[in-house]
């Protein structure tokens, strides 16, 4: 009775065990596991992966500029973010895909295989990039290695044409140890495709990517020839923010100074106005000095622009001071007590009666008050009247000379203004020509 009950139970247990055994998979049963084990079991990453040691391993390079992070003109350093790709053939990592469940591509750890020792010659800082520990290997032994790199490289930055400057920085890739007989370099894409490819570039920074030209060359040294590929990153600065914050305010201040020439030469407000413009320009120049890049090699053209504009403002103020000085000296030479250098501002421009004339008027009043009591008073009154008449004639001559002198100074002021305007125009044309020549505008 018991045996009849246990028999079906044992049958169920055996069926369940068979099903579990069928559904359980072990890594040893995976074709991918067998393939990776077979490829790496006897692999030596210290040996260049060729069967014929006289055959060079060709490494194909490609580069995508992702972003321009920083341009340090003072330290001559460029920081860029690039996508870098290496492709080479490893003869020790090929297989027949039909023997491994039609697997045509596999990912392997980069640390377990041979990799070319490619470096960037212009590197000046430790590269920082995400750790991508795997590479793709296909059945023919072709390996693809992708590297997003943040490159901090040395670059000869020319800021003379700032803010319309165009920079050309190079990134040179070469093997640090292997000569061209062992490791050769080549382009993964044609240089024409690399030059005009901007699809990966983030064009929302201060710089615009113009092109990425590339050249192949062999560097000869005492140890032999080394293959190298140089990528020239050509970029142009977006000048709008600097034009608005630096150039336009400076141009406005220069135009305001030109407008001050329409004030009369003998107007006191003219010198005060020009002095205020000069002080305002000096404060503006000090506040904006941090926006101009500093370079040891050369001073940016905009620095010369600020200096010459300030020199023009000083020249304009000095010219007005000289004109007022001429007018002041002329008035001092015309009479004993000088007039003020500016007309119409005080009571000094009204005719003043000398003490002698004042006494004459008083005497005349007193004489008439006494009804001409003394017989000699008529002669004295006549003498005083003649003195007043002579003074008025002298005053008229002085006013006429002053008017003629003002006309002469106005003509001289107009001549100086035209000369000032001519020099300013020549300077503006020269500055724009230099910016266009150096900046490639």
UniProtKB/Swiss-Prot annotation:
<dbReference type="Pfam" id="PF02931">
    <property type="entry name" value="Neur_chan_LBD"/>
</dbReference>
<feature type="topological domain" description="Cytoplasmic">
    <location>
        <begin position="325"/>
        <end position="414"/>
    </location>
</feature>
<dbReference type="GO" id="GO:1904602">
    <property type="term" value="C:serotonin-activated cation-selective channel complex"/>
</dbReference>
<keyword id="KW-0732">Signal</keyword>
<feature type="glycosylation site" description="N-linked (GlcNAc...) asparagine">
    <location>
        <position position="52"/>
    </location>
</feature>
<dbReference type="GO" id="GO:0042391">
    <property type="term" value="P:regulation of membrane potential"/>
</dbReference>
<feature type="topological domain" description="Extracellular">
    <location>
        <begin position="436"/>
        <end position="441"/>
    </location>
</feature>
<feature type="topological domain" description="Extracellular">
    <location>
        <begin position="287"/>
        <end position="303"/>
    </location>
</feature>
<comment type="function">
    <text>Forms serotonin (5-hydroxytryptamine/5-HT3)-activated cation-selective channel complexes, which when activated cause fast, depolarizing responses in neurons.</text>
</comment>
<dbReference type="GO" id="GO:0045211">
    <property type="term" value="C:postsynaptic membrane"/>
</dbReference>
<dbReference type="GO" id="GO:0005886">
    <property type="term" value="C:plasma membrane"/>
</dbReference>
<dbReference type="Pfam" id="PF02932">
    <property type="entry name" value="Neur_chan_memb"/>
</dbReference>
<feature type="glycosylation site" description="N-linked (GlcNAc...) asparagine">
    <location>
        <position position="287"/>
    </location>
</feature>
<keyword id="KW-1003">Cell membrane</keyword>
<keyword id="KW-0813">Transport</keyword>
<dbReference type="GO" id="GO:0007210">
    <property type="term" value="P:serotonin receptor signaling pathway"/>
</dbReference>
<dbReference type="InterPro" id="IPR008134">
    <property type="entry name" value="5HT3_rcpt_B"/>
</dbReference>
<feature type="transmembrane region" description="Helical; Name=3">
    <location>
        <begin position="304"/>
        <end position="324"/>
    </location>
</feature>
<dbReference type="GO" id="GO:0140227">
    <property type="term" value="P:serotonin-gated cation-selective signaling pathway"/>
</dbReference>
<protein>
    <recommendedName>
        <fullName>5-hydroxytryptamine receptor 3B</fullName>
    </recommendedName>
</protein>
<feature type="glycosylation site" description="N-linked (GlcNAc...) asparagine">
    <location>
        <position position="138"/>
    </location>
</feature>
<keyword id="KW-0407">Ion channel</keyword>
<dbReference type="InterPro" id="IPR008132">
    <property type="entry name" value="5HT3_rcpt"/>
</dbReference>
<feature type="glycosylation site" description="N-linked (GlcNAc...) asparagine">
    <location>
        <position position="96"/>
    </location>
</feature>
<dbReference type="GO" id="GO:0005231">
    <property type="term" value="F:excitatory extracellular ligand-gated monoatomic ion channel activity"/>
</dbReference>
<keyword id="KW-0325">Glycoprotein</keyword>
<dbReference type="GO" id="GO:1902495">
    <property type="term" value="C:transmembrane transporter complex"/>
</dbReference>
<dbReference type="GO" id="GO:0034220">
    <property type="term" value="P:monoatomic ion transmembrane transport"/>
</dbReference>
<dbReference type="InterPro" id="IPR049944">
    <property type="entry name" value="LGIC_TM_5-HT3"/>
</dbReference>
<feature type="topological domain" description="Extracellular">
    <location>
        <begin position="22"/>
        <end position="238"/>
    </location>
</feature>
<feature type="region of interest" description="HA-stretch; determines single-channel conductance in 5-HT3 receptors">
    <location>
        <begin position="381"/>
        <end position="413"/>
    </location>
</feature>
<feature type="topological domain" description="Cytoplasmic">
    <location>
        <begin position="260"/>
        <end position="268"/>
    </location>
</feature>
<feature type="transmembrane region" description="Helical; Name=2">
    <location>
        <begin position="269"/>
        <end position="286"/>
    </location>
</feature>
<keyword id="KW-1071">Ligand-gated ion channel</keyword>
<keyword id="KW-0628">Postsynaptic cell membrane</keyword>
<keyword id="KW-1015">Disulfide bond</keyword>
<feature type="glycosylation site" description="N-linked (GlcNAc...) asparagine">
    <location>
        <position position="203"/>
    </location>
</feature>
<comment type="subunit">
    <text>Forms homopentameric as well as heteropentameric serotonin-activated cation-selective channel complexes with HTR3A. The homomeric complex is not functional. Heteropentameric complexes display properties which resemble that of neuronal serotonin-activated channels in vivo.</text>
</comment>
<dbReference type="InterPro" id="IPR036719">
    <property type="entry name" value="Neuro-gated_channel_TM_sf"/>
</dbReference>
<dbReference type="GO" id="GO:0007268">
    <property type="term" value="P:chemical synaptic transmission"/>
</dbReference>
<dbReference type="InterPro" id="IPR036734">
    <property type="entry name" value="Neur_chan_lig-bd_sf"/>
</dbReference>
<keyword id="KW-1133">Transmembrane helix</keyword>
């Amino acid at each position: 009775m018991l045996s009849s009950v246990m028999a079906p139970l044992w049958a169920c247990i055996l069926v369940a065990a068979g099903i579990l055994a069928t559904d359980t998979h072990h890594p040893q049963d995976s074709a991918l596991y067998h393939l990776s084990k077979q490829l790496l079991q006897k692999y030596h990453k210290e040996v260049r992966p060729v069967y014929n040691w006289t055959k060079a391993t060709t490494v194909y390079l490609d580069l995508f500029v992702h972003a321009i992070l920083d341009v340090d003109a003072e330290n001559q350093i460029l920081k860029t973010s690039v996508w870098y790709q290496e492709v080479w053939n490893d003869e020790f990592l090929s297989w027949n895909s039909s023997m491994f469940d039609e697997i045509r591509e596999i990912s392997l750890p980069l640390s377990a295989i041979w990799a070319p020792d490619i470096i960037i010659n212009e590197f000046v800082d430790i590269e920082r990039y995400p750790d991508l520990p795997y590479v793709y290997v296909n059945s023919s032994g072709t390996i693809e290695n992708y590297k997003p790199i943040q490159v901090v490289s040395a670059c000869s930055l020319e800021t003379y044409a700032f803010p319309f400057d165009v920079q050309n920085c190079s990134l040179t890739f070469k093997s640090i140890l292997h000569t061209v007989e062992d490791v050769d370099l080549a382009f993964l894409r044609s240089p024409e495709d690399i030059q005009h490819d901007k699809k990966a570039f983030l064009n929302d920074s201060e710089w615009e990517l113009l092109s990425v030209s590339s050249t192949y060359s062999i560097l000869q040294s005492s140890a032999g020839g080394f293959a190298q590929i140089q990528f020239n990153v050509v970029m142009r600065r977006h000048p709008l923010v600097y034009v608005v914050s630096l150039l336009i305010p400076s141009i406005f201040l220069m135009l305001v100074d030109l407008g001050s020439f329409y004030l009369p030469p003998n107007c006191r407000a003219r010198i005060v106005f020009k002095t205020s413009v000069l002080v305002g320009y000096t404060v503006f120049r000090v506040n904006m000095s941090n926006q101009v890049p500093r370079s040891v090699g050369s001073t940016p053209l905009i620095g010369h622009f600020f200096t010459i504009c300030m020199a023009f403002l000083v020249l304009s103020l000095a010219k007005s001071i000289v004109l007022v000085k001429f007018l002041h000296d002329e008035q001092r030479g015309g009479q004993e007590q000088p007039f003020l250098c500016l007309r119409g501002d005080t009571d000094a421009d009204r005719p003043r009666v000398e003490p002698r004339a004042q006494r004459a008027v008083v005497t005349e009043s007193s004489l008439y008050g006494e009804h001409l009591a003394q017989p000699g008073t008529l002669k004295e009154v006549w003498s005083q009247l003649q003195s007043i008449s002579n003074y008025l004639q002298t005053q008229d001559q002085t006013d006429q000379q002053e008017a003629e002198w003002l006309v002469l100074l106005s003509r001289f002021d107009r001549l100086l203004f035209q000369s000032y305007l001519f020099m300013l125009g020549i300077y503006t044309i020269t500055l724009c020509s230099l910016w266009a020549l150096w900046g490639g505008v």
